């Protein structure tokens, strides 16, 4: 049984799947199969999925929230939101909010700098889907810690952001990270030149000049996150984008209101 206390281990792989690299798996969801040269065996191409998801089989159904029992694999909950590690555990914010984690992508030729998935959870090629719920977050069960989840990879973030809006946000962040960390990017090359000609004083000066004078693209990231969180859409929905710096760029985290235990038909 997986719980929030095991968040740092939140990768779920079935025994029949072949793990090819972090964030991809070989399964029946593969786009196409290919034959290895060594053994002539068919191997599924990698399929991207959210490595932050886990499943939970011991829970109470939404329609009977006081009776906890084991469920079969087809009716296991998919844990798509987690405790808010950015809030103090004794705070009201911790009790009333959750965090949806967007994974990094390593399958698009971008291993040298952080890049996050621009697909809403549940839209990935390797996502777990439910026949009747579609691409909507539908609470199906409640765990012993009082949190509600659905049967699919679709997270509550879909209640607040459309795919288009979400993609715009992630694309903006990815572009900033590319400009910052790309080995042969303009910023890195210029930064090296200035460091050489100033005998190492450039980095010292750059830390002490304001945003308007700094050429560091990461300053743009701080400004973008701050402006996005202050936008009417985010304020009204009571959601927040956590600065990727705070997560060490391991995931792109969205703070959302804690999903409620609503009845489903």
UniProtKB/Swiss-Prot annotation:
Predominant cellular place of this UniProt entry's protein = endoplasmic reticulum
Q: Which compartments does it reside in? A: Endoplasmic reticulum membrane
- Superkingdom in the source lineage: Eukaryota
Whether Protein transport counts among this entry's keywords is no
Q: Keyword Endoplasmic reticulum on this protein?
A: yes
Where does the UniProt annotation place the signal sequence? none
Q: Which GO terms describe its cellular component?
A: endoplasmic reticulum membrane; endoplasmic reticulum palmitoyltransferase complex
Keywords for the protein's UniProt record, in alphabetical order: Endoplasmic reticulum, Membrane
Membrane-spanning residues where?
none
**What membrane topology is annotated for this entry?**
Peripheral membrane protein
Any GO BP: protein targeting to membrane
Q: Which family does it belong to?
A: Belongs to the ERF4 family.
Q: What does this protein do?
A: The ERF2-ERF4 complex is a palmitoyltransferase specific for Ras proteins. Palmitoylates RAS2, which is required for its proper plasma membrane localization.
Q: Describe, as the record does, how this protein assembles with itself and its partners.
A: Interacts with ERF2.
Q: What name does the UniProt record give this protein? A: Ras modification protein ERF4
